[in-house]
Structures are given as structure tokens and as C-alpha cells.
């Protein structure tokens, strides 16, 4: 009874914890989504000439042209605009690009009106249809799509050559827009042999997991990620030389934040892949005029975001050059201004000699007279338009008068030298207005025109203000803000994105900006504006301290308060005067674990299953001639009672020690499969920068990892208890159905005078009709089906066998002892022991099948749509044959021999450790560990003089 209570208690705790995490994830601290939906008419046309003659995947995929029009696109297609090609993501569709085509056409029409007849810039939006393929689950599918993308780009560029129009430049490159895994396909494409050099120079990705695959259930996809990321790092390590094939490529990565429940937004970072000269990572919360979290699908149709992307496209294109885009520096400057959500400077410098500049004074809602003004270490907030560069800027900021602002390096008398124009931080105002904020730690120069002076627009000016908070997780801290513009509060101690916080406000605090420090090693722009709701705002951030995400190695720096403040991962910029109180939101923090550790809910329970199985075999081997195999219920209860606390200490210690380099060296040295280098956690990247990441266990170390590790292990143990009960319930119901349906059949009747006999011909036992089925399945694996399907069928077969054995035992137990199938108590115990063994294997195989389902889903989808997909699991008979033979062997009720128990211990022990330490990043190995175990148990059970019950053998 106590064992049942222990199991039940752990199961109830597990259910409660999972529900709490889910409620926290779904309901606590959600990003506010304020996306607008804009309807537009689109027309599509199949690019008919692009067939199997131009790509070996011409019959599998297709290419289309998308236009914002109510009229059909005439054939043959004659493109004439700037080429943009869209690559949809996992199970996506080619029509998703329609809203972008619509907003680009709308923006172009309005700019024509603004410029009074200028021809404007036309775009040709091409889109690839991958037939909703599951590219996130299968590496081979990812490679196929990348190869097809290169073929499509080459064909598109050739179309422009064939249809060249007088006065138009023939494009030699395209802009690629990728959603989700489409962004990864775009990065893979430039690494393949069929990539046409310089045919891609700008890539924009939306919610794309660049660093780590969202699911690691397929070995190929982890290998593709590893090779592609290594290629990009090695290329940029060459700098701007001709040895770098990617030197002219700029890439923008945009994430949706917490609202994206499909891809962890930590994985969008390009920090360790691309230098700042070529790449930018940001969040939709950070982007001016967007300022909202966006879910995984809405990122393609959110009106505010697609408007900003379309505006940026108009900024970076130049139809008069073959590349169709402006130089790399201009493109990156545009990306920073449009998407970083931060203040930036122009690259050009100018001097102001002998000008009459008036010192600025602190004050609110000032109306300045025409002329130059200057100040030092100032910040300003205004509704003026600051430093617009083009008609596109003017279109975006239709209200407000122009104000010119510079940051200067030096001042000598009335001269200001080495001045750069400031592009301000945009701040949301009331009634959908947009304000401009400028902060300068140095010399600020301001030029107020007569028009600006007479416009009635206002300026708030005050000194810059920054303070650091010595915060810890055990309490809260209260700050008073008195600055007339804003006050910056840094939190150097809050370094983990796994923890969420809550801020209570009072007084006149009307807006809080959360952002990362300007000098923080991370270059991912994660900021958001928070409006207090019932005097409260919720704080959470990505990137810093995220599991498995590479981070820059620390270099010796000053440790004074000012340096710590600027490098703090979390800053709060408080607009208004009042009090703010920050504290940890423990319930809200639980939801952060779900997105980061979904795969762990598969790998860690597998480790627990192998630990329990090790305990079962240890008891079985130590019990002598009267060997009894413990039931999974009993073994799990024993594990919880006697070993779980020790196991929690072990995993807590593992989480702590992996922060040491020599420990990680050793763990990578003993890893199966080998990573190729014991220094795999070190990432040598561009310009000598060195990044590192912890790719073991929880992907983090330190106090948070030490706390989370035991909690996750206890949760995994509870999952094993719950799954065990579910499998037992299923087999019990099936056995009841078998008993009722075959009650009168001779198979379940008890023959008299049956004795236990010995099988002297195990080879002959294999000459069984199920052997034909196994041979057929093996042939199909060699020729056509993936081994995951064969494994799933074997699992179903074992469940049926277990149910049959249970039904048979129940039927025999209902007879008197004199007519029992078993002549003595020892035989009954052996049968019960075997059923325990079969039930345990059923649970392990069911759990392993869950890991195989994603790859199996790719194959099933291909069959449904009539597409052939190459699988590495095709022809891989060794990955499932031991399991098939193991199931066949179980049908003869063979138990493992007691010889060589240490081999069983080693296999189970290392499988348990492997699933614990490497399971998150190598979940595909879960299948192979069971297959290895099945092969070994098959060998140990094939011994001469093995006891079986021949009359009960299942035909």
C-alpha cells in the first residue's frame, strides 16, 4: 500500500506541476498582441517553365509569382521588378507572402503620390510551394528544399535575362524572405554546390531558429545545423577578403518573443554566427511602430510588421545596379534604424566651424527659437521629426516638424567637430502618436529651423540618469524616479532569461521601456514598452543566460558600477515621476521552462526508465535460482523510495560541474555518438571572437541549473509513473477483451498433464509464421519504409502480446490447482515474472515510439501527397532488426540469462547517463539505445535448455 501511495503521490505531484507550468505558460505574463489585419487581393501564377528539366525536384515542389491584384497574371510571366523570393516554413504555404506583396504595392503607390509621379520601385514576389512539408522534423527534407531554392533563384535570374527590357538593369541577385524553417533553408542554400555565387545578398528571416533545431528527433537535422553553422562561422572568420563567400550577404533575424509558442525566441540570435557588419537579430517588441509580441503564424500577416519590412525594402533596394540593392553598409544601417528599437548614429561625420550655439536648459515642453543649441550629457524627448533621410522617412512620420540633431566628439570654442547625425529612439505616445528620444553621454548639438520653431512642437530636456540596483531573488527593491524625461535603472544581478519579474508602479509613471544594456555582449535587440495595467507590468527577456545558446566569453574589464550598469542584461527606462518596485514572479517564471525544455520531457523520462530497468535487472540477477523480475510499478516505487533523492543530488552536481572546462572536455570525449572534438563547446568565430555554450544536460550551469535539475528529475519520474499506468490500463483492457472474445477457444483452455519442457532447438523455434512477417518488414525497411515505422509496428505487436499473456494468465488462474496450466507455484511465479518483463519492455518501447513519431510523420505526409522523400533511415536495417527479433523472441516467453550481467549494467547505465547528459541535443539517440539493449537481451536469451511452455506458444 505504501508503494502505491508513493507512486500515486508522485503522479499527482507531476500532474499538478505540469498543469501549473502550462497555466503559467498560457496565462501568465503573455506579450500583449495588438496586430492589425489588413485585407488585400492577391493573384498567383505558376511559373510553368520551371520543371524537372531545371531541378530534380521539379515534380515535387513548384514556383509561383505573387502580385497584389484582382486580375490574373498573364502567361508567360515577364518579371520586371526587384526579385524577392519567399520560402515558407514547416507545414507552411506559398500564399503566406501575399500580405507582403500587398503592402509593398500600397506603399509604392502612396510614395508615387508623395513624389508627384516618380516611377517608384516595383517588386516581383516569387514564392516556393513545398506542399506543406515538415522541414522542421527532417534534415533530408531541409536539404531538398535548399537545393530547390538555389535552382529556383537561378531560373528566376535567367528569366530576367530572357525578358530584358530597355532601360532596366538585369538582376544578378535576389532578396530572400524566409519564415520559420524557411529562414534556415535560405542559410543552408548558400552552402550547397548548386548555389550561384552572389545570387543572394540579403536574407530576412521571421521566427527562424538559427542556433538550434526546434526538435532533435532526427539525426540528419542536427547534423545539417552543425555543418551549416560551422560553414557560416568559418566564412566570416575570413573577414572581408575574397576567401569569404558570404562577405556581401546581410541577414536580418526577427523573433516574435513570448507570443511565439512554436520556436523559442532565444534561438533566433545571430550573435555567434554573423558579425555585426553583416547581421542583426531583433524582436518584434523592439521594432518602432510595431511594439507588440507576435505569434509564429501572425508574423507573416501582422500589418505593423510587414509595413516596417516593406519600408526597409524600399530603403535598401537600388534597381539600377545588378545586385538590386545598396552597399552592405547602407543595408545594415537601414536595418539598425528600422528594426533595432534603439538609438543609432550615421556613419558620415561633419564639422561645424564657428557657429553660434546656445546652451540647452533643462525643462519640459520647451519651444526653442531658431538656431543652434548644445549641451553635454543630456537626454531629450520630443514630438519633432528628427533627421529623416528620404521620402520614405517623411511618409512614415507625416506629423511633426523637422529637427536636426548630432552627437559630436569634441567642442573647441564655437566649433564642433566629428559630428554624426543621431537617429532617435522612437517612443509610443498617446493617441497612436510617435515621439523621439535622444540620449547622449557627450556633446549634443541641436539645429532648430524656423519652421520647427513656429510649429508648436515641444521638447523635454534633462540630464541623463542611470543607477544600478543590487537586486537578489529573495526580496524586492523600490526606486523613486524624479527625472523630467526618463530614468534608467540597471540590474547587473539579473542575468537569467528563465526568471520573470513583476514591477509595481505608483505616482506618475506612465511608461516603462525594458531593454538590454548598450554594451552588453549580446547583440540581439530585445526591448519592449510596457504600459502599467492596474499599476503593474511584467518583465521577461530572451537571449541572456538562455539554455544551449552560445554566449561570448568574458574578457577582463573594469568592475566599477558604471561598467556593470552598461553591461547589465536588464535595464528599465522609466518615463515619469513616481516609484517602481521590482520582485520575482515565481509563478510567471514556470512558464518560461516549457518552451526551453520541451524536448527534455522526452529525454529525461527515458533516462529514468533505464535507471528503473537497471534496478529491475539488478534484482533479477541477484535473486538466484528463484529469480523474479520486479513489476515496473514495484521497481519505480523502489526507485522513488530509495534512490530518487540520491539521483537528485547527482543531477544537481552534474548541472554544477559542467561549468568547468575539463569536465565538459571529458563528457564530450565519452559521448556517443562522438562530436568530433572534445572542445566542441568552444566556438571560434569571426575576427577572433570566441563564443562558448553549454550543450550538456540543461544547457545552463550555476544556481538556477542546480535547482532545476532535481525538479526536472522528479518531474520525469512522475511522467514515468503516469505513462506506466496508462500502458498497463491499455493492456489490461485489451486482455479483458481477449478473454471475453476467446473464452471458449482451446488456446485459453487448460490442457491436462502439461509439464514444463525444455527447448533444445532455438533455431527451429524461429521457423514460425511470424518470422515471415519479420522478414517482410525487414525487406520493406531495406527498400522503402523508414525503420521508425517498423519500430512502431513492433511496439503495437508487443502491446498485443503483453495483453495476450495477461489474458492467458488470468484464464489459467481461474482454474483449480489440479487443472492449472502450471503445475506448481514456481511456474506461476515465472509466468508472472515474464509478464512483468514484457510490460516493462512495452512501456519503454511506447515511450521510444513517441520519439520516432515526428520523423514518421514526415514519411506519412509524403505518402499522402504522393511525394518521395529520401530518408537516412531507409536501408538502415540494423537500426530496427534487433528490436524485431527481440519481439519475436518474447513471443516464446524467453527471459534473459544471468550470464554476463555486467554488460547489461553497462548498457543500461550508460544509456541512462547519455539520455540525461546529451538527450536534449541528441533525442534521436533514444531509439538507438533501446535497439542496442534489445539486441543484447536477444543474445542473452538464446541459450540452450531455455525453459519455455511449448503448448502455449502463440501461433
UniProtKB/Swiss-Prot annotation:
It is found in: Endoplasmic reticulum membrane. PROSITE patterns: LIPASE_SER. Its main location: endoplasmic reticulum. It comes from the Eukaryota. The active site is at 180. One of its GO terms (cellular component) is endoplasmic reticulum membrane. It is a multi-pass membrane protein. Its EC number is 3.1.-.-. The chain crosses the membrane at residues 8-28, 489-509, 600-620, 643-663, 703-723, 772-792, 840-860, 870-890, 919-939. Pfam families: PGAP1, PGAP1_TMD. PANTHER family: GPI INOSITOL-DEACYLASE, NEGATIVE REGULATOR OF VESICLE FORMATION-RELATED. Belongs to the GPI inositol-deacylase family. This is GPI inositol-deacylase B. The gene is BST1B.
